[in-house]
Amino acid sequence: MKTKRVTIKDIAEQAGVSKATASLVLNGRGKELRVAQETRERVLSIARKHHYQPSIHARSLRNNRSHTIGLVVPEITNHGFAVFAHELEMLCREAGVQLLISCTDENPGQESVVVNNMIARQVDGMIVASCMHNDADYLKLSQQLPVVLFDRCPNESALPLVMTDSITPTAELISRIAPQHSDEFWFLGGQARLSPSRDRLTGFTQGLAQAGIALRPEWVINGNYHPSSGYEMFAALCARLGRPPKALFTAACGLLEGVLRYMSQHHLLDSDIHLTSFDDHYLYDSLSLRIDTVQQDNRQLAWHCYDLISQLIEGDTPETLQRYLPATLQFRHQ
């Protein structure tokens, strides 16, 4: 038999107080409105005894909010997005906010569907890593509810934004390694239309230039950010060269995953290749193959996204609407 949900009315009757008094106490306003301490303690004791939980629907009706935030990402299996989502969910949980997560599979049509689903669920705000070609839909949506873009900036959007500065650390990483590989340094990237792809290629090109090396067009190979694309691009490159490349930069952790899988399957993990990548993973410390990386601070990315969306939901104007965060370099080659 289904257990009856305990209501404020039930608690009020057991405590011998009015429903209004019980409601004030359970909503944390009893002391402020001079409800006697003994009465407050009696109401709270009965609520604890019955494991009372306030209705989120009633709370939403009172302040016209759903206390939910939507997060839209290309794929949750991506290590960077997974860590970001975990950090953001913890921040939301601590604030009593529910985080709703949807994936787009890098498909603009699917992105429109999941965004509309979020709107239908009346989220208070949305944080989006968009695969759209431009920000037109989000400019329109931002008139209806707060929107924060992260990781990607479609067509130099003026919307609130949180991103890692990809160019500066990538340039520094490559400039320090390139002098050892002046005759050959390959770049495997994702979709060229996405801002992270462009920024990381810009940093790669600048790093070569700082080392006095001109980028050769054939060194740049683009696909998408799925591990299978990294596998296929690296396989084609090895077939083209008849050997593994001497030096390689992958523009994301997923691409490097595909490269490592190919190398493992073809017994190339002990080959003489200098691997570098944007994005770090704790497992890289356990590999015999050393990998130098640009490491994003996903905790800071999540905090700044949460800070921006929270202020916008409250109707405040953040001091800085577009935030570019620094990254660190992880050198594993001696």
Curated annotation (Swiss-Prot):
Q: What GO molecular function annotation could you give as one example from this UniProt entry? A: transcription cis-regulatory region binding
What is the protein's name according to its record? Sucrose operon repressor
UniProt DNA-binding region: 8-27
Q: Which SUPFAM superfamilies match?
A: lambda repressor-like DNA-binding domains, Periplasmic binding protein-like I
Q: In what residue span(s) does the HTH lacI-type domain sit?
A: 6-63
Q: Which UniProt keywords apply?
A: DNA-binding, Plasmid, Repressor, Transcription, Transcription regulation
Q: Which species expresses this protein natively?
A: Salmonella typhimurium
Supply the Gene3D superfamilies for this chain: 3.40.50.2300, lambda repressor-like DNA-binding domains (1.10.260.40)
PANTHER family, per the entry: CATABOLITE REPRESSOR_ACTIVATOR, LACI-RELATED TRANSCRIPTIONAL REPRESSOR
Among the GO biological process terms of this entry, one is: response to fructose
Protein function? Repressor for the scr operon. Binds D-fructose as an inducer.
Q: Which gene encodes it?
A: scrR
